[in-house]
Amino acid sequence: MIQQESRLKVADNSGAREVLVIKVLGGSGRRYANIGDVVVATVKDATPGGVVKKGQVVKAVVVRTKRGVRRSDGSYIRFDENACVIIRDDKSPRGTRIFGPVARELRDKDFMKIISLAPEVI
């Protein structure tokens, strides 16, 4: 479960490698984030020369979780890691490439640009 102080791998080429969650957006006192939820995070590890620098505060959408999510047909989808994609305020990604699979639940939450850039949608 992703909450405050959780560390997420960054699944794009924005320059960040790892982020730490500061806040889960959506409602007062909301504790946990799942796939498709937006979080405010700070960059803990970054590649040199990237768009995003270490220490920067960014918004990110969760694209993979170890806990997984239940689908309407009763099946569960879960991944090997917790990962996110750094986004702008208009829900478009800051990077130009997405690495690894993303969940189909992002389509329901209008992250169509991330869906189109992803190599695999599960």
From Swiss-Prot:
Keywords, ordered alphabetically: Ribonucleoprotein, Ribosomal protein, RNA-binding, rRNA-binding
Domain of life from the UniProt record: Bacteria
Protein name: Large ribosomal subunit protein uL14
Gene expressing this chain: rplN
GO cellular component: cytosolic large ribosomal subunit
Record GO biological process: translation
Function: Binds to 23S rRNA. Forms part of two intersubunit bridges in the 70S ribosome.
GO MF, one example: large ribosomal subunit rRNA binding
Protein source organism: Geobacillus thermodenitrificans (strain NG80-2)
InterPro entries on file: Ribosomal_uL14, Ribosomal_uL14_bac-type, Ribosomal_uL14_CS, Ribosomal_uL14_sf
Family to which the UniProt record says this protein belongs: Belongs to the universal ribosomal protein uL14 family.
CDD domains: Ribosomal_uL14 (cd00337)
Pfam families from the UniProt entry: Ribosomal_L14
Quaternary structure and interacting proteins, as annotated: Part of the 50S ribosomal subunit. Forms a cluster with proteins L3 and L19. In the 70S ribosome, L14 and L19 interact and together make contacts with the 16S rRNA in bridges B5 and B8.
